[in-house]
Amino acid sequence: MESDSGNQDVDVALIGSGVMSANLGALLKSLDPGLRIELFEVTGELARESSNGWNNAGTGHAGICELSYTPDRGEDGRVKVAKAIEIFEQFEKTKQFWAHAVREGMIDRPGDFINQVPHVSFVYGREQVDFLKSRHEGMTAHPFFADMEYTEDREVIRQWTPLLVEGREDMPVAATRMQAGTDVDFGELSRKLIHWLGRQDGCAFHLGHRVTDLNRCPDGWELTVRDLEGGRTLKRKASFVFIGAGGGSLPLLQKAGVPEIRGYGGFPIGGQWLVCEKPEIVARHEAKVYGLSPGAAPTMAVPHLDSRFLEGRKALLFGPYAAWTTKFLHRGGSFWDLPSSIKPHNWLTLLKVGIGNLPLVGYLVQQGLQSMNTRLEELRNFYPDAKAGDWKLIDAGIRVQAIKKEDGDAGIVHFGTEVVTSSDKSVSALLGASPGASVCVDIVLEVAEKCFPELLGGKIAREKLEAMIPTHGIDLVSMADPEVIEQYRKWSRSAEEALGLSEG
């Protein structure tokens, strides 16, 4: 399928149809309607890799319940919450842009991709309870989290999330809750934005088209594109290329030969979910519940029990369970992806990952070899009365974590999102994972400001951007002025009303 026949020369080429390409394309076209933008997707459907709703947590990562963003205590013994505040601010920008897209008719029926679901942190055992209490004290000191509730009362937790306490032995427990959390189907959102983009003058998207090579040319880049269904090879020239191809980004950057990729590697981590679609169980859990990471687990494997709304139906997902893999893409990948990504400039980086992260490697192997009974034991840490017959195991996609040199030391695994941009600002790519999707608008704003300085520096574009994302350029992390706090809350309520997350 194609949105139209496409153009020989474009201003912007987007590789991959996930949430990053979708939001960047929509943002740039909104700021400059004259831009010619073309998108290429290797699979036969839009947003079916990491952005697909079944392949990610869909938490609307806002730092509310994800304890992995606040793992440390300061010298005073208090839990440090700065990272959670930063992520919440970034997700606010994301919601504001999506709300703008709804108001402008770019996307319809926001309930198809975003719904309000309470975000809960749940812990057990005295040490964990003390940690959560300190975290709550730090979080509620900021206006973002003023409404966060805390309890150690089992009966209150039973009212919030009954599955967590039924059948649980007598031990200290605690939970925090914010009603204003969200569940996001990033795949559905991406499809809506890309279909809108494809209807605009000078724009197109192509499915079943693999970008096989990137070569510099006088005015930017020449893309070699293989039409997988028709068997033909296309050439496209683009002034700017964004590689938002998930696990496919690193190999394309390597083919482009940009010096900035030297020393980077990719470390793929597979994932799986336990899924329950039994109506009587699903109906009793209306929350996203996060716990603490077990030992060497990467942040993407922090356990959580989530209420999800996917493809028009509700389900419970527990996990994810991490697994060792050498594939970079879930559907379009090959087991040769990791070996073929090893180059003279990054082999030492990858070797040091193996040596310096032996607990992580061992954890991934152990996770991949788990039996169903072992997985159910982990689930019962959250839901003690869980029955094997009510759950099935599905794949949860693949995250390729960025590996790079840092402070002269190679082999650092970055559980986050890395934006790599060439020195001439003609190509930019996204590496890494969580919390990428949720803070996608903040990330694509970074790309736009870095690579389109003339556009973003213009008066008209700045005014448009201010209307789209009112908090852009305003420091909300350290806000203390009552007037600023009240204005922020008005903007936030307006976005939530447009997205159907609160009553107008």
Give the location of each predicted region:
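Short beta-strand to alpha-helix junction loop
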Residues: 82, 86-95, 123-130, 176-198, ...
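Flavin (primarily FAD) binding-site architecture
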Residues: 243-259
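Dinucleotide-binding Rossmann-like beta1-alpha1 core, especially the glycine-rich loop
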Residues: 58-159, 315, 327, 335-336
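Flavin (FAD/FMN) cofactor-binding and adjacent substrate-gating region
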Residues: 108-117, 122-200, 204-206, 214-219, ...
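C-terminal catalytic lobe of FAD-dependent flavoproteins
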Residues: 171-180, 188, 328-457
